[in-house]
């Protein structure tokens, strides 16, 4: 059995990448989703019939280490999968995730085969300036880096960003194209090439750089970010969704770094297939679209009132509640 970690900062595109990657899945797979907020949304957006386990209300590298370990043990016993894909919270430090996963490497011989980091290249420099070492941690511990929103960035800017990334992590394999335009088989080929390069590097480097310590410090995200999440959401029209985009951009709810949700629709077009809006907001974009129930295999009856999650700083909870709740 192997563990694959698919990490990335808030809104980088981790869940979208996972859906792309697992679409060509040929092995028995289980996914662990970790959400910073109390309500898990990403599980509902995972497509296909792959088992998904949620660990919410914190980070699996810190306050939820015990839950994380127990989840992996339970998955091993129940499913005996060939691989476990872990999607940490967008505010997790990859170095801490690796410390926890190394326990299973030592105790059970489970290999951490890939440390994939999805980077929103459009917001890279802003995040680097705003979040410093906290943001750098994911990049410097990656074995593979893939870009989101690369089509929105000029080639000269891409080259400058690549130089900065190479300063942070000279050894990672960096895929310089849009991963959304390649197949899951091509993604697997990129990962396999990265694995071979890591093996070659180990053969020429005899120094032991494995950090086995499992001491867990206070999570820096607790000092930087806060989370607000709700169910029982009002029905929104398309006009309401456009207004939501403006409210987030102007700071009406506080400094929102990440927002996402599934919101009931009151549109006249609403039908059996289309009853909800899905929206996704990060530092560089706000997108919303109609979502069909058939595309939400993990959406159950308890979710029908909708879910909304906002992550940021100085969030105005009263305004958020009044705006979203019935």
PLM features per residue range, with description:
Residues 54-57, 77-79, 130-134, 192-195, ...:
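A general structural signal for short secondary-structure boundary/capping elements
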């Amino acid at each position: 059995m192997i563990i694959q970690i698919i990490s990335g900062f808030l809104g980088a595109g981790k869940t979208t990448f996972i859906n792309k990657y697992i679409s060509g899945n040929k092995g028995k797979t289980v996914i662990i989703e970790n959400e910073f907020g109390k309500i898990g949304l990403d599980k509902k957006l995972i497509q296909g019939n792959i088992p998904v386990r949620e660990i919410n209300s914190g980070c699996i590298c810190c306050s939820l280490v015990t839950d994380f370990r127990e989840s992996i043990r339970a998955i091993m016993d129940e499913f005996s999968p060939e691989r476990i894909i872990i999607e940490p919270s967008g505010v997790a430090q990859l170095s801490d995730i690796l410390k926890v996963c190394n326990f299973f490497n030592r105790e059970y011989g489970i290999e951490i085969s890939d440390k994939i980091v999805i980077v929103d290249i459009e917001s890279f420099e802003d995040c680097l300036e705003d979040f410093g070492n906290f943001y750098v941690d994911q990049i410097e511990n990656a074995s593979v880096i893939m870009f989101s929103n690369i089509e929105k960035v000029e080639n000269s800017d891409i080259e400058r960003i690549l130089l900065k990334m190479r300063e942070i992590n000279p050894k990672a394999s960096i895929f310089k194209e849009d991963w959304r335009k390649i197949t899951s088989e091509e993604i697997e080929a990129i990962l396999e090439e990265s694995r071979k390069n890591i093996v070659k590097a180990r053969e020429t480097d005899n120094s032991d750089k494995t950090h086995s310590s499992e001491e867990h410090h206070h999570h820096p995200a607790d000092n930087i970010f806060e989370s607000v999440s709700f169910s029982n959401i009002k029905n929104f029209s398309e006009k309401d969704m456009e207004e939501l985009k403006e409210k987030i951009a102007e700071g009406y709810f506080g400094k929102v770094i990440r927002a996402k949700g599934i919101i009931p629709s009151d549109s006249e077009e609403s039908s059996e297939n289309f009853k909800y809006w899905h929206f996704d907001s990060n530092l560089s974009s706000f997108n919303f679209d109609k979502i069909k129930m058939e595309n939400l295999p993990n959406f159950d009856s308890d979710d029908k009132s909708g879910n909304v999650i906002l992550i940021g700083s100085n969030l105005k909870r009263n305004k958020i509640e009044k705006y979203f709740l019935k």
